[in-house]
Amino acid sequence: PAAEHFSIVDADGNVIPWQKSADGRLVFFAKGVPAKGYKTFSIVHGGEQGENTVKVENKTIENKFFTVKFDKDMNIASLIHKATGRAVAPEGEVLNKIYAYDDRPFNHEAWDIKVYFDQKYTEINDVSAVDVTESGPVRTVIKVTRKFLSSTIDQSFIFYADLPRIDVDYTVDWKEKKILLKADFPVDVNATEATYD
């Protein structure tokens, strides 16, 4: 739709919050789509996008699920799960710390990672830009740009209004050789099984 005076509604007539993404796409939370099924949504004239419920203040981001505080290097210094009041990171640890490791394989360039790879490393803390690239009723996106030697690392932290999760999307323009990159998220979870990607 060319004009932004429209609404998205589901088959039951419920109005669904929406917003434009940083790259101009229409974004909304498709609630209630059955597994292996579908649900129809329609664009109708009139109405508004909805209100932003994700708060950004200084280096603190808050929605109804989490309170997140960033440190001076834009690493996550504190992530509190509001429903339980529990800190996700272990005491004294930060989430999202990026490391560059010396990568000197014996035989093969790709995936020949030796057990001692973590003995020589550099923390990547050179933040060159922090921008709020999206702020709307569906999500808020904080983009952090880091520099390392000749490379650039863009991290987009995505905080949703109605989803109990935080996504971190990486875009890396990597120009280095024999250097391994790692993002560290030490979480304080005591479980015999975990599902993650």
Residue ranges with predicted function:
Residues F185-D197:
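Polysaccharide-binding surfaces and accessory modules of carbohydrate-active proteins
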Residues P1-V172, A183:
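Catalytic and substrate-binding regions of extracellular carbohydrate-active enzymes
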Residues W174-I179:
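Extended, low-complexity, turn-rich repeat/linker tracts enriched in Gly/Pro/Ser/Thr and Asp/Glu
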